[in-house]
């Protein structure tokens, strides 16, 4: 496993995930009867600061259809959590107009790169072009100075 599991932290994420799903109207318990489901949800609400009991609640009461989605959500959250610790793996977001994103994505596909790699290449291309223009401008100025002195 690439990322270490932190049981207490992840238990809090699971609790928050289940509460969010409940508030969105999804059935988070495996109970068919409404009163049993409501009792289980009320128990869950009281367990926010008790990670071990949250895990027990999940084993006892959680709707099994949520299990896979919750695992995927927690796995993604764990990855983001550990990647955020290091500057080089931390993700940043930028706002792009849709047409700009579309053109960037098409360029990335043509080059066989990720969006990030394509952006880096575009920046490097622009820097090389700027450096080349500065060199040409300097050479042109030197040439004018030389020709201007001789004439």
UniProtKB/Swiss-Prot annotation:
Supply the Pfam families for this chain.
MatP, MatP_C
Please give the function described in this protein's UniProt entry. Answer: Required for spatial organization of the terminus region of the chromosome (Ter macrodomain) during the cell cycle. Prevents early segregation of duplicated Ter macrodomains during cell division. Binds specifically to matS, which is a 13 bp signature motif repeated within the Ter macrodomain.
What is a biological process (GO) this protein takes part in? cell division
Q: Can you name this protein?
A: Macrodomain Ter protein
Does the record carry Hydrolase as a key word?
Answer: no
Name of the gene:
matP
Organism's domain of life? Bacteria
Q: Where in the cell is it found?
A: Cytoplasm
Instruction: List keywords of the entry alphabetically.
Output: Cell cycle, Cell division, Cytoplasm, DNA-binding
Q: Which family does it belong to?
A: Belongs to the MatP family.
HAMAP family the record matches = MatP
| NCBIfam families, per database record | PRK05097.1
Primary subcellular site in the record, as a coarse category: cytoplasm
Its quaternary organisation is: Homodimer.
Q: Which GO terms describe its molecular function?
A: sequence-specific DNA binding
One GO CC annotation: cytoplasm
